[in-house]
Amino acid sequence: MPFPFGKSHKSPADIVKNLKESMAVLEKQDISDKKAEKATEEVSKNLVAMKEILYGTNEKEPQTEAVAQLAQELYNSGLLSTLVADLQLIDFEGKKDVAQIFNNILRRQIGTRTPTVEYICTQQNILFMLLKGYESPEIALNCGIMLRECIRHEPLAKIILWSEQFYDFFRYVEMSTFDIASDAFATFKDLLTRHKLLSAEFLEQHYDRFFSEYEKLLHSENYVTKRQSLKLLGELLLDRHNFTIMTKYISKPENLKLMMNLLRDKSRNIQFEAFHVFKVFVANPNKTQPILDILLKNQAKLIEFLSKFQNDRTEDEQFNDEKTYLVKQIRDLKRPAQQEA
């Protein structure tokens, strides 16, 4: 009978046991260089063996039974959590292997069940360790890859959204390292847009806190953060699932004032993204009195400003149609008393 675990002749249980032991050696502060080197080699070797079980090799497809055994061993031993907790102790290639192993095991399905998702729901610390990974440059991008894979699964996205740690994203997207800040923003955006109903529920329940933090991003000194945040705000407000949130946001005069200021930003791209949020205020047929007052007070200035606004975008038909529509809407604005007369 052929051995089911390929040429390494190591069972999933052996691989997990060896890897756990090698990780325990690396965790010790006072080990000799020789021992550390040996443990690092063992970790690399066992991670590769684990990948072969999950992904197969050129000669051999993955074996369902071996994959199931490996998954079970990872849960029972707590190794999945250890690999995330000790990611910075693993070498460069090994970190990439961990992310591939983690994401593969996370996607694993048995019928309609996703056992690793169920497991992480009971071991939520794994999610928060991944999130905290953004604070360590050497593991930030690996953690981002695993975190976004987690967010594909609604139960895991919900745990993060409803956690106190979610608000750490407002720090991470402002980080000075461009790659890390961009990666954090991609994860942040995923959380707010992937599961529409879940995101709408979250934004409705946490509106005040979320938008008071979000406004700081719109004032960011960092051009990329400011532009991405403005673009995402436009997407969130125009998504039909977020109708309640949009209605609330566009009823507040301070939000309109901010967009009018951003329309005059020194960056053309920021102006353009601000336009897409500003248009929602103007197009709203049920404007609140404070919004109407601001638009009427600035009516002539706005008409003149919009008539000349980015006129060189001649190819962008939709933008020009929207601009024409807004100018007409602002020109037709009247005070309610005048309308009744």
Swiss-Prot record:
Q: Which family does it belong to?
A: Belongs to the Mo25 family.
InterPro entries, alphabetized: ARM-like, ARM-type_fold, Mo25
Q: Which PANTHER family match?
A: CALCIUM-BINDING PROTEIN 39 (PTHR10182:SF11), CALCIUM-BINDING PROTEIN 39-RELATED (PTHR10182)
For this protein, the record's Gene3D superfamilies field holds: Leucine-rich Repeat Variant
Alphabetically ordered keywords of this record: Cytoplasm
GO biological process terms held by the UniProt record? cellular hypotonic response; intracellular signal transduction; negative regulation of potassium ion transmembrane transport; positive regulation of protein serine/threonine kinase activity; response to activity; response to thyroid hormone; signal transduction
Molecular function per GO = kinase binding; protein kinase activator activity; protein serine/threonine kinase activator activity; protein serine/threonine kinase binding
One Gene Ontology term, aspect cellular component? extracellular exosome
Its function, per the record, reads: Component of a complex that binds and activates STK11/LKB1. In the complex, required to stabilize the interaction between CAB39/MO25 (CAB39/MO25alpha or CAB39L/MO25beta) and STK11/LKB1.
- Subunit annotation: Component of a trimeric complex composed of STK11/LKB1, STRAD (STRADA or STRADB) and CAB39/MO25 (CAB39/MO25alpha or CAB39L/MO25beta): the complex tethers STK11/LKB1 in the cytoplasm and stimulates its catalytic activity.
Record's protein name: Calcium-binding protein 39
> Which cysteines form disulfides?
none
The subcellular location is: Cytoplasm
Primary localization? cytoplasm
